[in-house]
Every structure is written in C-alpha cells, then in structure tokens.
Amino acid sequence: MSESATANANRETLGFQAEVKQLLQLMIHSLYSNKEIFLRELVSNASDACDKLRFEALNNSALYGDDSELKIRIAFDKDARTITISDNGIGLSRDEAVEHLGTIAKSGTKEFFSALTGDQAKDAHLIGQFGVGFYSSFIIADKVTVVSRRAGVEANQAVCWESGGEGDYTVEMVEKATRGTDVTLHLREGEDEFLGGWKLKSIIRKYSDHITLPIVMKKEDWKDGEQVMTEEDETVNQANALWVRSKSDITEEQYKEFYKHVAHDFEDPLAWTHARVEGKQEYTQLLYIPARAPFDLWDRNARHGIKLYVRRVFIMDDAEQLMPLYMRFVRGVVDSSDLPLNVSREILQQSKDIDGIRSGCTRKVLGMLEDLAENDKEKYAKFWEAFGSVLKEGVGEDHANKEKIAGLIRFSSTHNDTAEQNVSLADYIGRMKEGQEKIYFVTADTFNAAKNSPHLEIFRKKGIEVLLLSDRVDEWVVGHLTEFDGKHLQSVAKGGLDLGKLEDEAEKQEAEKAADDYKELLEKVKTSLGDKVKDVRVTYRLTDSPSCLVSDEHDPSGNLARLMKAAGQPMPNSKPILEINPQHPAVMRLKYEESRFDDWAALLFEQATLAEGGQLDDPAGFVKRINDLMMALSAK
C-alpha cells in the first residue's frame, strides 16, 4: 500500500488496496439500478457495530459509559446535500479504519474476482453476495466521511476517514465527544431524491424493519404547506427481533428482507424454516437456504452463515458449531434461552447444549429439504444444482442422518443419459429389473468418461440402469454408503462381474470355456505387461471394446487413486486387473501374433487406461506403437 504524508502532519493519504479500487468501479456500475441498497448496507453495519459493543460489554460494562441505550440515527441536510448514518456502537480505531475501509481482508477475494463475468446482472449478484457493505455508499456519493471513536478510548483518539472513492483516502486523528461512528455521504449530482424523510423512511421500512435496534429520525410536521423537521425523535422501524415474533405476524416479504440482511445477499432465499423449540432446551431457529451457491462454497474453512444470539443478545457471527460442515450453505439465526451470555467458541466446542441445538437444526434443514424434494421438485432441482455436491459430504460426516441424506442425493444415470443429476436411489430401486439385487454405479472424473465407460457395455446390452458418478465427492459417497434400503451398492469397475439372477447361463458357460481356450494367451499377456497389472483375465462384461481395467474388490478404484494422487495424498500401491474380450477381433488376432506381440499387448493395456480416464506413463511411446502398427497393417 502506498503511503505519503501531507502538509498536515496528523493527516495521512493512503492508497486503496488494488481489489478495493476494482470493487468500487464494479459496484458503482453494476448496482446503480438498485442504488437504494446503500442504506440497507450502512444500517446493517451500524447494527453489527452495536451488537459487537453489547458482546464486548458483557465482560466490561464500563464500555457503555453513560450511554447504554443503543440506537441508529439517520439524518439528512438538504442544503449541504448530505445523509448521515450514526450509531453508538463499538466504533473504530485508526488502524481498524484503515483495515476495514481501505482493504478487503477476506478469504475468497481472488475467487470472487475470477468469478466475475462482465455480465452486469450476474456480477451484481456476486458483488452483493461478496458483501459490499460500506462501499455501497459510493453508488450515490462522490465523497464519504467517516468519523469514529472506539468504545473505551479518549475523545481525542477518534479517527476521521475520508475518500472520493477513487484511488486513495485520508485518515487523521480528531476529537469526537461520543462513542460510535458517523458515516456522512456527500451526494452526487442527481441523487436529491434521497434528501427527504419520506424516501429514507420508506427504504428503512422496506429493507431494515427487522433490525433489533431502534432506527431513529427527526420527526417532520407540515407547516405552511411544506414538511419541516422538528426536534422530536421518532423510531422508524419495528425494532424487535424478527425471529421472536409469531410466524403469523411475519409476512413473506419480511422473511425475505431479513434473509438479505443476515446473509448479505441481494437475491431472495430459496426456502426457509422458522421454529421455536421447547423442552429440555429452549431456542428459536430461523434458517434459510440461499438460491445460489457462494463463490467460496468449496472452502471448508470459510465463514459459516449462522448468527448466534443468547436471549436476543448477539454473541457471534459465524457459529460453525451450530451446523455441520456439509450444511455450510445454510444462513440464519439461532437464539438460545439456555446458554450463558459469556459463551465463547471454546465453550461452544464442549457444550452438550450446543450439540443438542446442532442436531435439532440439522434435522430441521433435512426436513425442509425432504419437503422440497417431495412437494416442489423444481425448487429442489435448483437447490441440488447449487448445493448438491456439498450435501453429499454428509453421507460420510453424519452417521446419525446418513439414510436421510442418502435419500436426498441425486445422480445422473444411464436411464436418461444426460449430465443432469435427477435420479434418487429410491427412483433407481423403483426401476430395478426383476431379480436385480444390487444398485450399480460407475465413477469417473467427467460425465462423458462415465457415460462412455467400457464397463457399461454388458449393462446397456441387458437394459440394466447404472448410476453415472463424476463429482469429485462421489468416491467419498460410495466409500461410506455401501447400501440403501437393503440394496448393496456395487461398482461395475471393481471385482468380478456378478449380475446375480440377471446372468445368462449360456453366456457364463461361454466365458468359462473362453477362459480355458485363452489360458496360454492370458499368461503371455501378463508376462509381457509385467508389473503394470495384477492379473489378466477373460471377461464377458465387454461387448464392443477389446479390453478394460478393473480394480480388485478391496482396492481403491482407478478414479479414486487419481484423485488422491492429484491431492498429494499417499495411496497404497495397487495394480489394476486387465480384462480382455475374447470376441473382439484385436484379441483374436493377438492369439496368433508373434512378431509384434508386446506392442499389441501394451496397446490393449494403454487403450483400457485411457478409456477409464487414466493417464499414460509414456504417451509418446503409445503414439509410436499406434503409428507402427497402422503402417504394418497398411503394408499387408
């Protein structure tokens, strides 16, 4: 960050972090059509500042001084063309002002910028999701002044931060008589519509009615045919916690606006659940499922979305103990009646009360998803597209709810042969052929690799459905989900082919006869390939391909081995089994090949490796072999 002192020894001019400059430009252009959200964002920040003071004051009540009545004040000045949002919350020190207002100290910043598309509507959603907060001021202001004094410091230790939203800003130490923060917006030309009490109040009631603190403005009265400001305060919002109100008193619009506040999202939520739990533990939960995935969904260390309150006192923002990791997409509020007010993250980790709340919240979200899956398939398909891969993690992480989660999972399959994941395990079982005892699946690193796997040939021939698994997490799923509803899950690429009652006796006998006829060839191929394979055997799972690779029943699949290797994880050194199709012309030819036997054997192994999505140790050698064999064949 560049830094140069100005003539005023107390004032410094600092350069914005590069990402802030980029965000400001994006935001001013992408969000202009929705510019009134600046007030929602600044009120939300003011509310958070008061929550933080309340929390710190639990251990140090002196922070309140003689001002314990927390509130947010909004004022406007038509002559100066300014709007000021004030709070008496925790306030900012000089260093905090530089850190929070001059930089984006957020994980996922890089991912956020790489996700931007240039499409104004899509980028507006992403920017909102990233949390523009304070920077939304610049949508309507060409200069923003922030004066703040942190709770517990002297009046002369306040800070003034000021910027025109271009490349830099200034900070200087100033005097401020009271604790808290004043954000003053100097409006751009053409934004005078916001310099009126009615307009500001309507925005507050639309977006911030649920804020638990009073939002006050000076009352206006009619005098001589115009609105005149009085000295009397009026509270503009309802100023009580939305989640403690009766469900029948809350409109759908109010639920949606509260979600946007709590999740810092611009879009409406997909679904929500609101319940008061009584009995051994008492708490209220208001939990939302967003409509879209955040850009940092795959960061398992990213902030979680549940705010914890104790008896309506804010405790913490991202209480990860309240929701399992595989539900990190859930947003909302939990308000406990039983936890101590001085609860810390360490206490949360060891609290049986928290375990109970977590279990209750998890069951509630799973119930909401089951209801969507049953009664609103279109919404559930939206949910699955956004969060399905994350929900799959729960199969291995949440033993108590494993069956419920398994019932909610959706897969692609050979039933419709499209990449859309819309087949449940119950759907699959409902379509099983008479006599079929297992749920068959294949794993691969892409949908097309799964769909075109040679392992499917016999299944397609017999009309047996196979699940096509190509999400990275799918290997984890099938590693932990070995059966569903009494049916064993079986990889079509592991172990010997066992179709149970679906086997054709004549085919089986033919395969056994071929194994005898090809015994000598199998030994010869195994010797030629050396330590590349564990074994070579005849198969009848292939109808069109000459060969395929399978893993032993208890070895990791080839796809899992590749995933682990790519992640730098150690894997046991297991070798594949090469299976050959005795009906294929290439295999028949090999039986009588002498001069180029090793090349043909290597080719069978290499094309089987490629067909299952593997990589060759020596691609150049493979190409040379192909070319040599093509030349040899064309010369005949």
From Swiss-Prot:
Gene3D superfamilies: 3.30.230.80, 3.40.50.11260, Heat shock protein 90, C-terminal domain, Histidine kinase-like ATPase, C-terminal domain. InterPro entries: HATPase_C_sf, Heat_shock_protein_90_CS, HSP90_C, Hsp90_fam, Hsp90_N, Ribosomal_Su5_D2-typ_SF. Its main location: cytoplasm. The keyword Nucleotide-binding applies. Residues 1-345 are annotated as: A. It is found in: Cytoplasm. Coiled coil: none annotated. PROSITE patterns: HSP90 (PS00298). Homodimer. This is Chaperone protein HtpG. The lineage of its organism: Bacteria, Pseudomonadati, Pseudomonadota, Betaproteobacteria, Rhodocyclales. The gene is htpG.
